[in-house]
Amino acid sequence: MKKMSIVGAQWGDEGKGKVVNYFSEKFEWIVRFSGGANAGHTIYYKDKKYVNHMLPSIMPNSQSKGFLGAGMVLDLEKLVEELNILEADFPGMSSKFYIDLEAFLVLPWHKEEDEIIESMRKKPIGTTKRGIGPAYTDKVSREGIKLYYLFDEKMLKERLEDIYYLKSSLYGNKLKTSKDDVFEYLMKTKNELEKLKINYASAVEMGNVFRSTSVLFEGAQGVLLDLDFGTYPFVTSSSCMAHGVSSVGFSTFELDEVYGVLKAYTTRVGSGPFPTEIFGEEAHKIRELGKEYGATTGRPRRVGWLDLPALRYAKIRSGLTGLVITKADVLNGLDKIKVCTHYEVNGKTKDTPSSSYDFFVAKPIYTELNGWKDTNDINFLKYLSYIEEQIGVDIDYISYGPKTEEMCSKNDLILNMENK
């Protein structure tokens, strides 16, 4: 049975949620394998907008089920909120979701820590202040709380006692959240989840299920925000690449396809290097047409031209076998469109960054292509072909609007052009 992974090929916000929705009816399981409430995946169903930060992107009318894997850090309050929104419109939908008992939790003091640490930095790194970084830090330093602790109150209280002792020693009176506050929060959200009839499982239990059926693995953020290979330190705290499926007990060798999602241009939220960034009226126009404001933070996204060296880097790092291009319609009507083909790095021309260091010092080298009136224009097809030739991976699907149905295969696009 087919196994596919969808990952962001840029700095996140590429439209992965919509792409997952488009494919979801072909898969029995949609699995989130990393990240937390710092991701914002927007979907449209019957002209209504839903923004999921925690939940896998499955359509309400789909037979697919969703799994939240152990590589995530779960904000249970946000999870309950999202489930309640879906339940109000689609009663019983919560029972389609399963949570890995091995997943770590974002706790109230993690959000406090996020604020405290960001305020102490000489230069902010642009955290979403959702507690993601501190939660992953606790995971690595063995100070975290896993979901299964909620089902053993004695063990939970002992763990909270130990963790609070350390945190109060580190932060003193700056930390306002007590261990009792956290315990009450966890019991409250646990009860709310039980009322919603969400399911609990583990990747060990689900391993045979996943291997005997079709699974779509939904990545969060993008390759250039990956903890190991992104523009460190301006990155997220987890894996954004296909190899993140290991947190669900899978290997990348078990994946049949890895699709990278990219915009027809480039955006970035927060601080960090951005070689093709543009400013002024040109940037403002693209930002407004593309509604480039963060689904999680509402922050205006930085905007730039398409960056082919960054895409080549993403292809190599995440083993991309196909591409999906989104927001193609945003560039409609422009006479000329710039594309970065190479970087100049310390006086040398490079087609692909050697490491994430290159992003910090790169000067973009551009070529200029003819624009298009709409996505049925031959110049748009030439734009796609140019990207394919440069990257060495086919663009198989095109998104030209926010709704799930505003997407087609490249073959259908060509047929439509030929029939006009």
Swiss-Prot record:
Residue sites binding IMP per the record: D13, E14, G15, K16, N38, A39, G40, H41, T128, R142, Q221, T236, R299
Chain sites annotated for binding Mg(2+): D13, G40
InterPro entries (UniProt xref): Adenylosuccin_syn_GTP-bd (IPR018220), Adenylosuccin_syn_Lys_AS (IPR033128), Adenylosuccinate_synth_dom1 (IPR042109), Adenylosuccinate_synth_dom2 (IPR042110), Adenylosuccinate_synth_dom3 (IPR042111), Adenylosuccinate_synthetase (IPR001114), P-loop_NTPase (IPR027417)
UniProt: substrate binding residues: A295, T296, T297, G298, R299, P300, R301
Pathway: Purine metabolism; AMP biosynthesis via de novo pathway; AMP from IMP: step 1/2
EC identifiers of the protein: 6.3.4.4
Disulfide bonds: none
Requisite cofactors: Mg(2+)
Enzyme class: ligase
The keyword Metal-binding is assigned to this record: yes
Free-text remark on how the cofactor is bound: Binds 1 Mg(2+) ion per subunit.
Positions annotated to bind GTP: 12-18, 40-42, 301, 327-329, 399-401
Swiss-Prot/TrEMBL keywords: Cytoplasm, GTP-binding, Ligase, Magnesium, Metal-binding, Nucleotide-binding, Purine biosynthesis
Subcellular location: Cytoplasm
Any Gene Ontology CC annotation: cytoplasm
Residue numbers annotated as active site: D13 (proton acceptor), H41 (proton donor)
Family listed: Belongs to the adenylosuccinate synthetase family.
Oligomeric and partner information: Homodimer.
Purpose: Plays an important role in the de novo pathway of purine nucleotide biosynthesis. Catalyzes the first committed step in the biosynthesis of AMP from IMP.
Protein name per UniProt: Adenylosuccinate synthetase
Organism: Petrotoga mobilis (strain DSM 10674 / SJ95)
